[in-house]
Amino acid sequence: KGPMVMLGYYKDPEATREAFDSDGWYHTGDLARTDKDGHYYICGRCKSVIVTTNGKNVYPEELESMLLKENAVKECIVTGAEDERGNTIVYARIFPDLKAIGATYGNRNITDKEISKAVSEAVKSVNSQVVSYKAIKRFEIVDKEFKKTTTSKIKRNQ
């Protein structure tokens, strides 16, 4: 709320109504936490949070940022998915960094098996750094970059 906050969404009164409360406060949709010193940290977005079957919240952005630090991963999207028993699990779609993977094999042509191994190791590395309910249970390797917005952000709904 204040003079520097937007007045609303252009030609979208419904989105404007959803974003502002009755007192005029703008709700960004960001989720945050505070540490013991009172510092705020943005964890993720309300619209993208994954609620596991046991009720735990998983913030995809946290896992995506960890995956992107791995050499084998160029782009990724983390979402919720159902396993064979209908439970919600953490699922990742990963576009591999073929150049980085190739560099580990002397810049020769790399096989699908080598790509799969490198991505699998990246997922294992991330999983070793998080609590079990946040672990990526299933992943898929995609062969094309993800569609992007005009600001070069990956479109989540693909």
Label every model-predicted segment.
Residues I77-G80, V123-Q158:
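Conserved C-terminal "lid"/linker of ANL adenylate-forming enzymes
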Residues G2, L7-G8, L31-V130:
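AMP-binding/adenylate-forming catalytic core of the ANL superfamily
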Residues A15-T16:
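Short secondary-structure edge/capping micro-motifs at helix/strand boundaries
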Residues K1-G2, V142:
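A secondary-structure boundary/capping signal
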Residues G24:
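A structured beta-alpha segment of the ubiquitous adenosine-cofactor-binding alpha/beta core
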